[in-house]
């Protein structure tokens, strides 16, 4: 049975103490529900930090759902305490402009809490608007940034600022970049590159989630920003 935790939080307690534990932020949306599914399928213990627990439709003995806001630092810290890694799929509004950068504020609290409780592994996301030192100059590394500048300038700024904040800290981070998540069937086949490999922008949300979860037990892309597509 899933243990529900109220907004004040408690430290994660699972039936088994020998399993890897991860905290997932943004666990009630499109990609996020698949992150929960694949993490639980791998036998991980999962603490899902959400604003609205009724949106979490999965029930599992190794899933704890904790309710909180992104500005609630103490509750975020409690969710991360005892975990081995963090996955964030916190979104940003894909609008021309908007008022507050809630995802950035939440990331600052997540990073601060990780450092305070001694958790170093972070898997996060961005778009190819965020440039990486190993990127080749190609359509997929250039055009998304131009499009975002025209259509979603504030979202682009927030995503880049989040990526900069993650890289500035002494964390074992991986930032998974993608362009066009779709509600298409899971394939299990993901193309990975840095602009030199031809791929389609569109990719199934579940494929994104599975790739992010896979990074928990892999060191291949630590301090790296792979671009994934289909």
Go through the PLM ranges and name each one.
Residues 23, 54-109, 113-116, 216-217:
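NAD(P)H-binding glycine-rich loop region in Rossmannoid oxidoreductase-like domains
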Residues 163-184:
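Conserved beta-loop-beta element that borders a ligand/cofactor-binding pocket
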Residues 45-47, 53, 97, 105-154, ...:
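Conserved Rossmann-fold NAD(P)-dependent oxidoreductase catalytic core, especially the SDR/UDP-sugar
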Residues 23, 47, 174:
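Conserved beta-strand positions in the Rossmann-like core of class I SAM-dependent methyltransferases
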Residues 103-105, 158, 176, 203-213, ...:
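Substrate-positioning beta->alpha
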Residues 22-42:
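N-terminal Rossmann NAD(P)H-binding glycine-rich loop of SDR-like oxidoreductase domains
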Residues 49-55, 178-180:
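Short, polar loop motifs at secondary-structure junctions
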Residues 136, 185-190, 215-224:
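Glycine/proline-rich active-site loop of Rossmann-fold NAD(P)-dependent oxidoreductases
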């Amino acid at each position: 049975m899933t243990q529900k935790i109220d907004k004040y939080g408690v430290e994660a307690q699972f039936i088994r103490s020998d399993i890897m534990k991860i905290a997932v932020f943004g666990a009630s949306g499109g990609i996020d529900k698949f992150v929960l599914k694949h993490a639980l399928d791998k036998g991980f213990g999962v603490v899902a930090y959400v604003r609205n627990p009724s949106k979490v439709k999965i029930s599992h003995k190794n899933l704890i759902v904790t309710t909180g806001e992104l500005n609630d630092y103490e509750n975020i810290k409690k969710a991360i305490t005892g975990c081995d890694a963090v996955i964030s799929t916190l979104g940003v509004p894909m609008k021309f402009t908007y008022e507050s950068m809630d995802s950035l504020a939440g990331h600052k609290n997540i990073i601060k809490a990780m450092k305070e409780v001694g958790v170093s592994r972070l898997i996060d996301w961005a778009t190819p608007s965020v440039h990486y030192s190993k990127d080749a100059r190609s359509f997929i590394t250039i055009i998304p940034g131009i499009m975002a500048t025209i259509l979603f300038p504030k979202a682009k700024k927030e995503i880049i600022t989040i990526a900069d904040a993650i890289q500035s800290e002494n964390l074992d981070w991986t930032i998974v970049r993608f362009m066009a998540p779709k509600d298409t069937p899971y394939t299990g086949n993901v193309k990975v590159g840095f602009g030199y490999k031809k791929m389609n922008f569109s990719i199934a949300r579940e494929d994104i989630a599975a790739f992010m979860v896979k990074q928990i037990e892999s060191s291949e892309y630590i301090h790296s920003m792979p671009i994934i597509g289909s």
